[in-house]
Amino acid sequence: MEHSAWHDLIKKELPEGYFAQINHFMNEVYAQGVIYPPRDKVFNAIQTTPLDKVKVVIIGQDPYHGPNQAQGLSFSVPDQVPAPPSLQNILKELADDIGQKQSHDLTSWAKQGVLLLNASLTVPEHQANAHANGIWEPFTDAVIKVVNQKETPVVFILWGGFARKKKALITNSIHHIIESPHPSPLSAHRGFFGSKPFSQTNHFLVAQGLEPIDWLK
């Protein structure tokens, strides 16, 4: 993170001493118990998707909290791990919208410019949202603000009420917002299914003269 192009711009959006506070927090929680993702994957979203490559942002809430699932990219799991319910529904909507993606691992999206950002970057094992206590949100809000400042158009995909609250941070009119209910089984049938976010995103990117995302890769 220290050497990425993100660092200085994110730092400008944060209070003095915030990075030291985050470092102290991580030292403490990783020493106390099982935390996901592995520490070297905490900043995976911004490490995998350089700022100048960002074309799409998909905002999640916090990492998966089961063994071997979280890899620092929202909604993504390694291929050897079964897809959790929300990811199953994302892949089902993708199949209906564009075509079948075989992989559960969304790293290929991240490498194409899809920033897979969780609002909280860590979670204790089997304790969903336990770190949604304000420690991470200044950081992830700063990431969104930095992307908002880009002079090239970006698609923000906001699934569910939590992600939709981030719309207040997206003030640059060149960007495009796609919103729907969350892909969770609790809400997917209330408007996520049939929303076609993937083809919508590509139509916008192509209209702006940008390369579309190969969502099936």
UniProtKB/Swiss-Prot annotation:
EC number: 3.2.2.27
Chemical reaction(s) catalysed: Hydrolyzes single-stranded DNA or mismatched double-stranded DNA and polynucleotides, releasing free uracil
Catalytic residues of the enzyme: 62
Superkingdom of this protein's organism: Bacteria
Example GO BP: base-excision repair, AP site formation via deaminated base removal
UniProt keyword list: Cytoplasm, DNA damage, DNA repair, Hydrolase
Name of the top EC class for this enzyme: hydrolase
Main location: cytoplasm
Example of a GO cellular component annotation carried by this entry: cytoplasm
Subcellular location per the Swiss-Prot or TrEMBL entry: Cytoplasm
Positions in coiled-coil regions: none
GO molecular function (one): uracil DNA N-glycosylase activity
Family: Belongs to the uracil-DNA glycosylase (UDG) superfamily. UNG family.
NCBIfam families xrefs: PRK05254.1-1 (NF003588), PRK05254.1-2 (NF003589), PRK05254.1-4 (NF003591), PRK05254.1-5 (NF003592), ung (TIGR00628)
Role: Excises uracil residues from the DNA which can arise as a result of misincorporation of dUMP residues by DNA polymerase or due to deamination of cytosine.
HAMAP family in alphabetical order: UDG (MF_00148)
Protein name as catalogued: Uracil-DNA glycosylase
Organism: Streptococcus mutans serotype c (strain ATCC 700610 / UA159)
